């Protein structure tokens, strides 16, 4: 049936609802939005590896950057990183609304990729510690390198340049994204809650 929590990604995927979400977040409707949502790495707190000042210099006229940090790692987020360009949404109650507000997601190995793929929007994978994560920390339960629905980027500069050239990057990785969606999002139709309700009622 898909996941009931993801039904909202269909129901609210429209200009009015997205504008309303941006207003709740304090983001201008005119701005495009990037969300950086890295996974928890077990042994460390959050450590910003993206050169925020360089990113800001390149894209601040057009974008806002939202940081969605894992609860176990958010203590490592330095308050002096935050300003009108960088906002902390780690405690925002609905990650689904954050997905809807985001034009691009930057992640790494997080399950964010499976839900955000439903929206068919670009994803960038900042995998600066790929070998360590795969071989030492947590590993993968699918062939991440072969099946990732976006580019695997090792450096901050690669991330920034991918954002600057996002239309080209998205086009180059669209085939991978569509394969990923077909494999992992097949049952996501926006009707999971209704399907489950109907099945429960049939069994009464």
Residue ranges and their predicted role:
Residues 1, 89, 153:
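Hydrophobic residues at beta-strand termini and immediately following loops
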Residues 3-6, 91-94, 128-132:
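Short, acidic/turn-prone active-site loops that include or flank metal/cofactor-
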Residues 5-79, 153-155, 185, 192-194:
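Conserved catalytic-core segment of nucleotide-activated headgroup transferases in glycan assembly
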Residues 62-63, 85, 102, 120:
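Short, well-ordered alpha-helix to beta-strand connector turns
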Residues 84, 111-184:
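Catalytic binding pocket for nucleotide-activated donors in carbohydrate/polymer assembly enzymes
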Residues 188-204:
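C-terminal alpha-helical cap of glycosyltransferases
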């Amino acid at each position: 049936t898909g996941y009931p929590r993801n039904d909202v990604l269909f129901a609210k995927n429209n200009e009015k609802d997205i504008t309303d979400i941006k207003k709740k977040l304090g983001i201008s409707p005119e701005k495009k939005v990037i969300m950086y949502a890295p996974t928890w790495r077990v042994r460390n707190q959050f450590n910003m590896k993206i050169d925020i000042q360089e990113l800001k210099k390149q894209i601040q006229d057009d974008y806002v950057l939202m940081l969605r940090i894992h609860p176990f790692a958010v203590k490592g987020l330095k308050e002096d990183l935050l300003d009108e360009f960088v906002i902390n949404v780690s405690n925002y109650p609905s990650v689904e609304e954050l997905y809807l507000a985001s034009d691009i997601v930057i992640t790494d190995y997080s399950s964010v990729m499976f839900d955000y793929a439903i929206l068919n929007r670009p994803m960038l994978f900042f995998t600066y510690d790929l070998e360590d994560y795969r071989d030492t920390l947590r590993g993968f339960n699918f062939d991440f390198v072969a099946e990732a629905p976006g580019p695997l980027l090792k450096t901050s500069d690669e991330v920034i340049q991918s954002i600057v050239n996002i239309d080209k990057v998205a086009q180059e990785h669209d085939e991978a994204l569509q394969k990923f969606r077909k494999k992992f999002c097949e049952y996501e139709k926006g009707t999971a809650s209704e399907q489950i309700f109907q099945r429960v009622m049939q069994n009464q």
